[in-house]
Amino acid sequence: NGENIAEVWMSAWSLGLEWTEGVSGYHGANDYHMGNAWELDRVIDLAHTHRLYINLVLNYHGRISTWCDPEWHLHPYNKATPGGWLTRPLEFFSDERAMEMQRRFCRYTQARWGWAPAIFGYELCSEINLTGHETHHKTHFDPAVVAWCRTLGGYLKNIDAYGHLVSAHVSNDYTFLNPALCNLAEMDFNPLDAYHHGQPERIIPLVAATADAGAAFSKPILITEFGGSPMAAGREHLLIEQHAALWAGACVPLSGVPMFWWWQV
């Protein structure tokens, strides 16, 4: 169908390496799921065969959240799980032991898959503003979260001989961008969402406004999650929305056309 890039999440339910002991195939912090690693090998091989690039998502909001798609209660760093040591989800971003676990995870990921031509880049966390325990959608303004992106992004760049792009993704839309995060030298581009929330007449203005907002940071901006509603719509509506976004994205200075959330279409 002409698609040449996709996001792949290393999620707890598929392709993740590190999760709570007792969940099938997982063995807690710093003990990786070799079955899922093998499966990701196959995914990357398949992507290479079809000339498809993968933006590999290392963490996602739910695993560090108590309120949005919450999985924190099962996180292996949570002291409520066997071997865990953290009390609150935001400690994930500031605790030195947690940072060391993330460095090891990044090192393994880069060593095992960094050679692959199909790897486009590494996304440190998807929808990072939905992490934590507060529902304001602005966790990414926390200085500890920004510092985590700087530190882990810098570490990945230091160990990556291939110079893959590094990013951290923000949910909602361009109005939620944090300049302090967007301007980090360790972030190569700024990925974000764009949902029109039941107002299809907003598709073209939303895409155009996203491009305008990205220009302020002098680096590429890319809509990596687009759709009418994250809760879906009819197939006909989805196809119309995708058509509008593809054309709009090609006519404004985005680094690529919006990436549709509903891959099944």
Where are these predicted regions, by residue range?
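Active-site mouth of glycoside hydrolases
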Residues: 1-189, 193-201
